[in-house]
Amino acid sequence: MADDTKWGIAHVHASFNNTIMTVTDQTGAETLAKSSGGSVVKQNRDEASPYAAMQMAEQLAEEVLDQGIEKVHVRVRGPGGNLQRSPGPGAQAAIRALARAGLEIGRIEDVTPIPHDGTRPPKNSGY
């Protein structure tokens, strides 16, 4: 007996200035819902905060559950490249809020871009 529940992919781009969340179908071709930190908080400094990520995740979960998606795989992305490899403060809060809002979490995957010896990093990067 096959499981007929629909899966989606929750893309969480968490930088230190903003957090952007998008939910797509399994192929990633069709966007089902999207939100960013600036759409849920007033202050620019709060866009990357865990509170903003929680509010965004609750909104997205509500929209996606209405469309019939019950389970999601989460793809977390940090700034990457020559910037930080670690995601911003909103990433963990977003995953927790998605689970708390009624979505079942499948896989959690880190898709931060890592250069294969790309351009020279800035001299004050601290690596």
UniProtKB/Swiss-Prot annotation:
One of its GO terms (molecular function) is structural constituent of ribosome. GO terms for cellular component: cytosolic small ribosomal subunit. The keyword Ribonucleoprotein applies. GO terms for biological process: translation. It comes from Halobacterium salinarum (strain ATCC 700922 / JCM 11081 / NRC-1). Belongs to the universal ribosomal protein uS11 family. The keyword Ribonucleoprotein applies. HAMAP family: Ribosomal_uS11. This is Small ribosomal subunit protein uS11. Part of the 30S ribosomal subunit. Located on the platform of the 30S subunit. Pfam families: Ribosomal_S11 (PF00411). PANTHER family: 40S RIBOSOMAL PROTEIN S14/30S RIBOSOMAL PROTEIN S11 (PTHR11759). Keywords: Ribonucleoprotein, Ribosomal protein, RNA-binding, rRNA-binding.
